[in-house]
Curated annotation (Swiss-Prot):
Species: Saccharomyces cerevisiae (strain ATCC 204508 / S288c) (Baker's yeast)
SUPFAM superfamilies cross-referenced by the UniProt entry: Ribosomal protein S5 domain 2-like
Coiled-coil stretches noted in the UniProt entry, renumbered to this chain: none
Species classification: Eukaryota, Fungi, Dikarya, Ascomycota, Saccharomycotina
Subunit details: Component of the RNA exosome complex. Specifically part of the catalytically inactive RNA exosome core complex (Exo-9) which may associate with the catalytic subunits RRP6 and DIS3 in cytoplasmic- and nuclear-specific RNA exosome complex forms. Exo-9 is formed by a hexameric base ring of RNase PH domain-containing subunits and a cap ring consisting of CSL4, RRP4 and RRP40. Interacts with NIP7 and NOP8. Interacts strongly with RRP46.
Keywords: Acetylation, Cytoplasm, Exosome, Nucleus, Phosphoprotein, RNA-binding, rRNA processing
Protein name listed in UniProt: Exosome complex component RRP43
Length: 394
């Protein structure tokens, strides 16, 4: 006797994902769906930038001109907010001794003449850079990532080759602290003396010192590429830097230190203890005309298969799709995970408000980068740089 079998009916229901979940599961599909509607996953237009809000010099020791925080070692700072991302930049400094005198600092006429002949050989040697450390907070601890090290190195190299920070702006014009007859101390600085003879006689030293600047850049709530945000925040912070004045004690200016080499020969070397003034400072003199601001762009091809179609006319629209024709669009100011992971062809530009361009980086890995796209991105970068330059207000 055959046993009766019952067939169970299985119903399959379509699963609907929220936009943020779909962006995680299939970022490329999420991006194409949004682009087919003429908007981006962040609900901005193709060439629309995020709004930027900044706060300058609020973390510095010189934030309050009437009350200097002597326990604070930050010389300049900036807090930049772009969309949901916050970038905090703080600049500190130190003083180093120049181990070898520059050719132009020597008194010998022959060496000076040699410098004049060879000075055009390497112009970049007349400029310095900042030593940045980028930290992208992700709620974990550990060693720095490859991305953080790459961005830090790129920031250092870009500042150097943009010729923003001349070495002469970092020269320490050391003063001399002397004791007065009433027991008080006073400090004389070379640029504050009216008598040039007294300046050359008493304050001329063979030892040379220079300031060195360090930048710590912390990125919070990262939602996309961060190099342009770090660069712009660093530009704002550099414009607010004030360098503390430095001096040496008059009683220590004539000290000599004996250095023995292998116990046989001895050389006499001057020794100084250089001290930073707690109250006096000078602004950092940078090349304002070379200040540039960063912007990034992405090129993506619209996929007809991923477009949202009207259910009433789905058959007609399927016939009209031409797979050989792929429209390419330019996306400004990449944001969200869907755009960062799905767009492989990118353009990164450093543009000055004056119209000069300091850096252009093209990365091709997906859509074709056409000359029209490059021209459009250069134009947008100039407009963006002009807008960001007006936001700086100390």
């Amino acid at each position: 006797m055959a046993e009766s079998t019952t067939l169970e009916t299985i119903e399959i229901h379509p699963i609907t994902f929220p936009p943020e979940v779909l962006a995680r599961i299939s970022p490329e599909l999420s991006l194409q769906r949004h682009l087919s509607l003429g908007i981006r996953p962040c609900l901005r237009k193709y060439e629309e930038f995020r709004d930027v809000a900044i706060e300058n010099n609020t973390l510095s020791r010189y934030a309050d001109a009437g009350n200097i925080d002597t326990k604070n070692n930050i010389l300049g700072s900036n807090v930049l907010k772009s969309g949901k991302t916050i970038v905090i930049t703080s600049i500190t400094g130190g003083i180093i001794e120049e181990t070898s005198a520059a050719i132009k600092d020597l008194d010998d006429f022959g060496e000076e003449e040699l410098f004049e002949v060879t000075k055009e050989e390497d112009i970049i040697a007349n400029y310095a850079s900042v030593y940045p450390v980028v930290e992208v907070e992700r709620g974990r601890v550990g060693a720095c990532t490859d991305e953080e090290m790459t961005i830090s190195q790129k920031l250092h190299d870009s500042i150097l080759h943009s010729r923003i920070l001349p070495k002469k702006a970092l020269k320490v014009k050391a003063g001399v602290r002397s004791a007065n007859e009433d027991g008080t101390f006073s400090v004389l600085y070379p640029d504050e003396l009216e008598d040039d003879t007294l300046n050359e006689t008493n304050l001329k030293m063979k030892r040379k010192w220079s300031y060195v600047l360090y930048a710590k850049i912390v990125v919070l709530s990262r939602t996309g590429p961060v190099f342009d945000l770090c660069w712009n925040s660093l530009m704002y912070a550099l414009q607010s830097v004030k360098l503390p004045r430095a001096f040496i004690d008059e009683r220590a200016s004539d000290l000599r230190m004996t250095i023995r080499t292998r116990g046989r020969s001895a050389t006499i070397r001057e020794t100084y203890e250089i001290i930073c003034d707690q109250t006096k400072s000078v602004p950092l003199m940078i090349n304002a005309k070379n200040i540039a601001f960063a912007s990034n762009y992405g090129i993506v091809e619209l996929d007809p298969e991923c477009q949202l179609q009207n259910s009433d006319n789905s058959e007609e629209e399927e016939v009209d799709i031409d797979m050989d024709k792929l429209n390419t669009v330019l996306i400004a100011d990449l944001d969200t995970e869907a755009e960062e992971t799905s767009i492989h062809s990118t353009i990164s530009i450093l543009a000055a408000p004056s119209g000069n361009y300091k850096q252009l980086t093209l990365v091709g890995g997906g859509a074709k980068i056409t000359p029209e796209m490059i021209k459009r991105s250069l134009l947008l970068s100039r407009v963006r740089a002009d807008d960001l330059s007006t936001r700086f207000n100390i």
